[in-house]
Amino acid sequence: MRRVSMRSLKRYLKAIWDLLRLEHGLMYGFGVVIGIYVSDPFFSDLWKLLLGYLTAVFLQASTFALNDYFDYEVDLVNNRTDRPLVRGDLSRRIALALAIALMPPGFVAAYLISPLAFIFAFAVSVLACLYDYKLKELGFAGNVYIAFTMAAPFLFGSIISSGWITEKTALLASMAFLTGVGREIMKGIEDVEGDALRDVRSLARTMGERKAASIASLFYLTAVSISPIPLFLLPEFLFDLKYAVPVSVTDVLLIYVALRLVGDYERESIRKYRKVTLVAMVLGLVGFFAGAF
């Protein structure tokens, strides 16, 4: 009996983790830390750093729970067994309750940092709710929003440490944004059947999967094209191997995906390529963080 109970508890906790996508929250929090130190390598207020990290984790978890609440029927059609609601491990009511409960702590943490930090966090969260409810159906506009959320942690970090968005952070955010748009267009290809249920106007549905894949490739190549800029224009990164080496690997991975997408945009391939781009983004974060010191 005890063994069964422990197994049930582990399954429940895993379902909560999967619903909230806490691995993404940890990465978003790390993005805030990177934004802080890319903007100001000598930042020393650990209390604000912790608050910034918690803001990202709480708000990200809340919006992912809300996303699964609204996307339940689409995820069923797409057979998204990685989603706990589809597996039956959690109810939609629990997902909605968690979405509502986790947002206020994120706002409180942001408010304790500064008024500007609170305004930024609140605005991003409002957009997140609109996206989960309706913006997603607008297709490319929704892709742009999600890509912005990938860049937002760096901008938020810069606001925490410098009170504004620095050039260094803006470049980092731009690369994250461009890569994020590519990833979201690919997700539209992967989810094209389920998106028909909500009449999501993704590029894959409005222009065809082949053209959508080509556009995603273009965004990846654009991200690669701006990655050398810090090496030549920002004094802190001038010919810095700590930045150049990991970012070069990032570029190679993104170029690989961009070239493969032109002729291979099957569902299974898209899933694999999205994982490759996630690795590329993590390496890019490492490069910017290392180059800041």
UniProtKB/Swiss-Prot annotation:
Its EC number is 2.5.1.42. It is found in: Cell membrane. Pfam families: UbiA. Coiled coil: none annotated. It is an enzyme of class 2 (transferase). It is a multi-pass membrane protein. GO terms for molecular function: geranylgeranylglycerol-phosphate geranylgeranyltransferase activity; magnesium ion binding. It comes from the Archaea. The chain crosses the membrane at residues 26-46, 50-70, 107-127, 140-160, 215-235, 237-257, 273-293. GO terms for cellular component: plasma membrane. Keywords: Cell membrane, Lipid biosynthesis, Lipid metabolism, Magnesium, Membrane, Phospholipid biosynthesis, Phospholipid metabolism, Transferase, Transmembrane, Transmembrane helix. One of its GO terms (biological process) is glycerophospholipid biosynthetic process. Its cofactor is Mg(2+). Belongs to the UbiA prenyltransferase family. DGGGP synthase subfamily. This is Digeranylgeranylglyceryl phosphate synthase. It comes from Archaeoglobus fulgidus (strain ATCC 49558 / DSM 4304 / JCM 9628 / NBRC 100126 / VC-16).
